[in-house]
């Protein structure tokens, strides 16, 4: 089932285990699906306690995304931490294309 056009939640966290914990908490808290994960090793990775950033991309209604992001952020904060978060209520067509990209694929 395609959820294109629905709201998107973006939660960037430190570490893969933190990303899985955040995604799990988000999916349990609301009717959302995981669009994809993406990863990034920052230029200053050697100076970071956790040298990997993971972006969790979630899909659902705006109300569900808000609830899911809150739960995911809470779970991630208790572990490796959250770098940034953002909600896109109605993604534009070109943004939709970018949401499909994943470094894990």
Whereabouts are the PLM-identified features?
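Long, contiguous binding/interaction regions
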Residues: 1-53, 57-105
């Amino acid at each position: 089932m395609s959820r294109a056009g629905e709201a998107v939640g973006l939660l960037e966290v430190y570490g893969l285990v933190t990303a899985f914990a955040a995604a799990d908490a988000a999916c349990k808290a609301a009717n959302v699906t995981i669009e994809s994960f993406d990863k990034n090793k920052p230029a200053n990775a050697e100076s970071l306690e956790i040298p990997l950033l993971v972006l969790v991309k979630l899909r659902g209604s705006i109300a569900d995304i808000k609830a899911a992001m809150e739960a995911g952020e809470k779970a991630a904060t208790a572990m490796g931490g959250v770098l940034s978060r953002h909600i896109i209520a109605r993604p534009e067509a070109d943004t939709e294309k970018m949401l499909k990209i994943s470094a894990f694929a």
